[in-house]
Amino acid sequence: MTDGILGKAATMEIPIHGNGEAGQLPEDDGLEQDLQQVMVSGPNLNETSIVSGGYGGSGDGLIPTGSGRHPSHSTSPSGPGDEVARGIAGEKFDIVKKWGINTYKCTKQLLSERFGRGSRTVDLELELQIELLRETKRKYESVLQLGRALTAHLYSLLQTQHALGDAFADLSQKSPELQEEFGYNAETQKLLCKNGETLLGAVNFFVSSINTLVTKTMEDTLMTVKQYEAARLEYDAYRTDLEELSLGPRDAGTRGRLESAQATFQTHRDKYEKLRGDVAIKLKFLEENKIKVMHKQLLLFHNAVSAYFAGNQKQLEQTLQQFNIKLRPPGAEKPSWLEEQ
């Protein structure tokens, strides 16, 4: 009955056998992270209720907390408010029940995959792209960290050059016999300081752009990837459940459960395929955006650094103009907070 449905999937199911390959799986901390990811989607209940009896109990078994503090001796029939309270408690019980069943199935599926007793659906091409994105993000984070370190060093160098230029200028006024030597050294330090401020502005722009790419664009795509991975786990959990029911005996009771399981499986399959498509689209747009952004930023970084160490002040200023980077005029005071508004 399910062969037609399962055969249409664009992905493949990779069986995992307990023949010793389980030793190559990730460490236990990775398993704990996956289990936490399964458990984070628990229900959010605004009101607390106590459930008496088992799952098969009636709605009367739901007792709102606080109702037993002052027991009433009145035998008057229940009013509309009591019926509403029972209805709300029943809905919350259903939410908790569904969440518990879903969590149990997903945890069972996850453990089955990890210990080599189950199969998982894998889109090989998409999984490769996701792993490549995570590796790229780690490398870009390293570049971002180094860029911030370079910014800090440049700022410290500028402060030292500025102080050294002031010291040379002061000594030029107080040492007539060395006035010329102190004078041109002071001018050299001031020129280096000016070019350094221009370079610092370019590096700051470079770091800011990479930070946006890593913490905004890439992170947004990875959030969708996490949703996709959770949907994949749910899909496989309900697929396994449907397969087990299909292999069991067929009677009147089983037929109803099989139809219900098939409907639930189809819902999770649709969710999984939708998120798989979303991830593929976001990965494509992310790659295009990354190439566009980094082409501009790497050109800026190369031109600015080359011009600075070549002592080409004109080319350095032209580089900032080319990328529309504006700096405060040399010697200008920092504007007040009111002027910045």
Curated annotation (Swiss-Prot):
Gene3D superfamilies: Arfaptin homology (AH) domain/BAR domain
Record's keyword terms, sorted: Autophagy, Golgi apparatus, Membrane, Phosphoprotein
Region annotation Disordered: where it falls in the sequence: 46-84
Recorded superkingdom: Eukaryota
Domain called AH: residue spans: 121-321
Gene Ontology biological-process annotations: actin cytoskeleton organization; intracellular protein transport; mitophagy; protein localization to phagophore assembly site; regulation of Arp2/3 complex-mediated actin nucleation
Subunit structure: Forms homodimers or heterodimers with ARFIP1. Interacts with RAC1. Specifically binds to GTP-bound ARF1 and ARF6, but binds to RAC1.GTP and RAC1.GDP with similar affinities. Interacts with ARL1. Interacts (via N-terminus) with IKBKB and IKBKG; these interactions inhibit activation of NF-kappa-B.
InterPro entries assigned to the protein according to its UniProt record, in alphabetical order: AH/BAR_dom_sf, AH_dom, Arfaptin_fam
Protein name as annotated: Arfaptin-2
Function according to Swiss-Prot or TrEMBL: Plays a role in constitutive metalloproteinase (MMP) secretion from the trans Golgi network. May have important functions during vesicle biogenesis at certain cargo subdomains, which could be predominantly utilized by secreted MMPs, such as MMP7 and MMP2. Also involved in autophagy by regulating the starvation-dependent trafficking of ATG9A vesicles which deliver the phosphatidylinositol 4-kinase beta (PI4KB) to the autophagosome initiation site. Involved in phagophore growth during mitophagy by regulating ATG9A trafficking to mitochondria.
Phosphoserine carried by residues: S72
Compositional bias annotation for Low complexity: 65-81
Localization of this protein: Golgi apparatus; Golgi apparatus, trans-Golgi network membrane
Gene that encodes the chain: Arfip2
Pfam families for this protein: Arfaptin
A GO MF term: membrane curvature sensor activity
Keyword DNA repair found: no
GO CC aspect terms: cell cortex; cytoplasm; nucleolus; ruffle; trans-Golgi network membrane
